[in-house]
């Protein structure tokens, strides 16, 4: 009898686990749909889409825009800053007005999650709609984020030329692609409906990205973590960074980053929903979903500033697919095996003729 019961449990357990994951996947899709509704409500009210990063990104108290910096460690309470995420912009349209009212946009945006942060009360919050229930890497939940807006598109660029020219937002990389990115959302200058000749239904707006593993620096990185690009340069071409990180083999390094999208326990810094950057709320379509390569930064493994470019791919723990929110509000499951050219084209506002044929919708 015991053996029979054990066999029945063995048969039923996978079915139960599958049903639970199916429910989590549906909830993940619903979260993205809610984000999509908020984005469209924002556009209807403002006549443009949310900015993933405001200008100036970093200026001193006199208003002088800083050109050179590699992180926000030196930001003081009196600085002028603009690295507020698209997530922050849509909060009022997600019935989160209470949190919005707590954010002091006229004071410096700070990533250190202590009482000295101007917005600590607002950011010391968990927003369930920003958390994928299947994401096993979620930690304390507070300020954490599983969903990212598509800024880079088919480029690895973050919105500025490099970490020494953070105030240069126009121009092209060595591959001719715009340093402002070609995704649905553009740092510093908002996109509008007229900027989508391919149509909203053919352009990815948001997707999911597994949070960092939260491991210690003495451990190997997982696919959820970021590394510094081997042979890094300040402004790599798309294929250069893709090839450099495609064949990477995990190694212990102080330059690995384990806290993407997270506020790890014991850490005073958050990389969650309030903040701009590839370390927190932005992604691109340079690499396919759940790719076998390693996400990486070209100048730093913590690509939080606009001049720190990166491959930040869509990733999930749903199996062999990711959920993608398109500009018309539709949410589609995209398989890992999607053709890379198609995936990159779906990440752009205006693909070349024929690029979006054979797509996923």
PLM feature segments, named:
Residues 18-361:
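Internal low-complexity, small-residue/proline-rich segments
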Residues 2-15:
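Alpha-helical hydrophobic helix detector
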């Amino acid at each position: 009898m015991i053996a029979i019961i054990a066999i029945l449990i063995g048969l039923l357990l996978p079915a139960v686990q599958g049903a639970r994951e199916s429910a989590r996947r549906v909830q993940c899709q619903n979260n993205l749909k809610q984000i999509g509704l908020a984005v469209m409500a924002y556009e209807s009210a403002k006549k443009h889409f949310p900015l993933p990063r405001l200008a100036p990104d970093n200026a001193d108290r006199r208003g002088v825009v800083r050109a050179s910096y590699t992180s926000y460690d030196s930001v003081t309470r009196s600085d002028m800053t603009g690295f507020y995420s698209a997530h922050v912009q849509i909060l009022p349209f997600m019935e989160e007005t209470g949190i919005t009212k707590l954010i002091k946009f006229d004071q410096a945006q700070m990533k250190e999650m202590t009482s000295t942060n101007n917005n600590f009360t607002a950011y010391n919050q968990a927003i369930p709609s920003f958390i994928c229930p299947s994401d096993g890497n979620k930690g304390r939940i507070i300020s954490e984020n599983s969903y990212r807006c598509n800024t880079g598109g088919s480029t690895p660029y973050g919105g500025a030329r490099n970490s020494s020219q953070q105030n240069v937002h126009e121009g092209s990389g060595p591959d001719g692609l715009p340093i402002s990115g070609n995704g649905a959302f553009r740092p510093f200058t908002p996109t509008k409906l007229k900027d989508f000749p391919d149509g909203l239904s053919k352009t990815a707006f948001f997707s999911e990205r597994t949070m960092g593993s939260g491991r210690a620096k003495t451990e190997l990185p997982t696919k959820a973590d970021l590394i510094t690009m081997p042979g890094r340069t300040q402004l790599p071409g798309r294929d250069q960074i893709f090839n450099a990180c495609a064949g990477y083999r995990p190694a212990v390094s102080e330059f690995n980053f384990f806290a993407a999208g997270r506020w790890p326990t014991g850490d005073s810094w958050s990389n969650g929903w309030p903040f701009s950057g590839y370390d927190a709320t932005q992604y691109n379509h340079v690499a396919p979903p759940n790719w076998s390569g390693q996400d990486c930064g070209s100048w730093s493994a913590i690509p939080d500033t606009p001049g720190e470019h990166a491959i930040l791919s869509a990733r999930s723990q749903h199996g062999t697919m990711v959920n993608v929110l398109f500009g018309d509000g539709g949410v589609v499951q995209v398989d890992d095996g999607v053709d890379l050219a198609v995936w990159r084209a779906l990440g752009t506002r205006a693909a070349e003729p024929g690029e979006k044929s054979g797509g996923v919708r």
